[in-house]
UniProtKB/Swiss-Prot annotation:
Membrane topology: Multi-pass membrane protein
Residues passing through the membrane, by range: 12-31, 59-80, 97-116, 123-130, 155-176, 181-200, 205-222, 224-236, 254-272, 287-310, 340-350, 358-380
GO BP terms: regulation of pH
Species this protein is from: Shigella sonnei (strain Ss046)
UniProt protein name: Na(+)/H(+) antiporter NhaA
Pfam families in alphabetical order: Na_H_antiport_1
Length: 388
């Protein structure tokens, strides 16, 4: 029990469970004995009915639309906390990770488009390598233990949170189709109710969650991706402490283990099961997976390093205390771990077009993410001196 408690207390535990879930999915999807069961599980229909309102989706879509909304609720809470009290609370603190994140989104997207611009279908996946899997990246960094300067951990977390915020904006602007104005109207009313609750100082988290369920349903029916409802709810839950208690921090504390040890691993299990049948070197080096691999493995560190260098040269920001530029470059490589966020965007980009494209995209994401994890970890291990 002591070893189990030590494992779950480690920052690396969430990343390790993610890896196990992804490997298990790959094994089951490629085994004759279990592939049928794996796909049957994902296609299991689940129906929710309240009066005349009916939501009928398969298990995969419930995981991607409902459970991931809880993940984005946690992201919303984290972003709000960092903006108001944490590493993004002042312009001086926020400048370096914000500039790094912008470079880490622009350059991978441009590199992907360099491979895929001529194809109007695969071009839609330009945002896939712009994402970073915060849990996976922090998990890999945690494997290095106490050698990692606290400032470097905070930099990676701030960068990844801004990256997540960028991904949310991208999803809202570029991966939303066929809008239902009636449902958007209901969503607008729900958001207004959340704002009133916040302004009136209501601190009962359950009330916000209840309105959040209405908002999630309306957003789902509107054509906008339902996970955005989670972020909106997270922004409205009060952060300010009263009698030593903060509703937002308390909910963040409650949600974190559920997201790290259940929701993200379940998402990885449901989405990482790519069949390798028929996969060839020619296929893996075709424009879609190659663009993703190049974006994650080259574009991410290049964009982050280049924009950080420009920020330092132009005196727009300064290095976090106790870190070196070489360490920042290594963190840039770790940000190439797109994994769950990249898979999520790939499912939005190609889900209604061609399932085969999603498979090739997932292969590119897995190769790019694993390569980034191994290279980033190795580089940091060399660059960080053991603590005495």
């Amino acid at each position: 029990m002591k070893h189990l408690h030590r494992f779950f207390s480690s920052d690396a535990s969430g990343g390790i469970i993610l890896i196990i879930a992804a490997i298990l999915a790959m094994m089951m999807a490629n085994s004759g004995a279990t592939s049928g069961w794996y796909h049957d599980f994902l296609e299991t229909p689940v129906q929710l009915r309240v009066g005349s309102l009916e939501i009928n989706k398969n298990m995969l879509l419930w995981i991607n639309d409902a459970l991931m909304a809880v993940f984005f609720l946690l992201v919303g809470l984290e972003v709000k906390r960092e903006l108001m009290q944490g590493s993004l609370a002042s312009l001086r603190q926020a400048a370096f990770p914000v500039i790094a994140a912008i470079g880490g989104m622009i350059v991978p997207a441009l590199l992907y488009l360099a491979f895929n611009y001529a194809d109007p279908i695969t071009r839609e996946g330009w945002a896939i390598p712009a994402a970073t899997d915060i849990a996976f990246a922090l998990g890999v960094l945690a494997l290095l233990g106490s050698r990692v300067p606290l400032a470097l951990k905070i930099f990676l977390m701030a960068l990844a949170i801004i990256d997540d915020l960028g991904a949310i904006i991208i999803i809202a602007l570029f991966y939303t189709n066929d809008l239902s104005m009636a449902s958007l109207g209901v969503a607008a009313v729900a958001i207004a109710v959340l704002a009133v609750l916040n302004l009136c100082g209501v601190r009962r988290t359950g009330v916000y969650i209840l309105v959040g369920v209405v908002l999630w349903t309306a957003v789902l029916k509107s054509g906008v991706h339902a996970t955005l409802a989670g972020v909106i709810v997270g922004f409205f839950i009060p952060l300010k402490e009263k009698h030593g208690r903060s509703p937002a921090k308390r909910l963040e504390h409650v949600l974190h283990p559920w997201v790290a040890y259940l929701i993200l691993p379940l998402f990885a299990f449901a989405n990482a099961g790519v069949s390798l049948q028929g996969v060839t070197l020619d296929g893996l080096t075709s424009i879609l997976p190659l663009g993703i691999i190049a974006g994650l493995l080259i574009g991410k560190p290049l964009g982050i390093s280049l924009f950080c260098w420009l920020a330092l040269r132009l005196k727009l920001a300064h290095l976090p205390e106790g870190t070196t530029y070489q360490q920042i470059m290594a963190v840039g490589i770790l940000c190439g771990i797109g994994f769950t966020m990249s898979i999520f965007i790939a499912s939005l980009a190609f889900g209604s077009v061609d399932p085969e494209l999603i498979n090739w995209a997932k292969l590119g994401i897995l190769v790019g993410s694993i390569s980034s994890a191994v290279i980033g970890y190795s580089w940091l291990r060399v660059r960080l001196r053991p603590s005495v």
